[in-house]
């Protein structure tokens, strides 16, 4: 049986300091964005927007605030689907399986190189596309193999989904 070669999680110098950022340049998809540390809060959202190192959007400012408030040495943003879209309605109607597989490879790399706590933060956006719940379950399964803990912040939605970081109260911890 051949072992999968994982990508190497490498920090780089970007505006605002040292960051994890994959790919290393702005493309129509993003796998990893976050601060470097051994014990990160790894936030799992639905899809990336325009954020990049040194230019965080309101969602990532909330992620950073909650990671700091809860004693994590860093944070990493991951998404169920890596396609960038400022409006989730613009996400692919059919998932690009190559993007999905590469996203899972990067998640495996993060899990192998850090001691994370996972934050379920996809909100009701998980219902935007039929394929999103299945992709989310694939990600959860990878963390279960390593017995990695999961957390949520804020109350669950009426449909039972974890809160999206953008819609948490500013005093949430």
Label each PLM-derived region with a short phrase.
Residues 49-71:
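A short mixed-secondary-structure module that forms the rim of ligand-binding clefts
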Residues 27, 56-64, 97-106:
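Short acidic (Asp/Glu) patches
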Residues 47-50, 83, 125:
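A short, flexible beta-alpha/helix-coil linker loop
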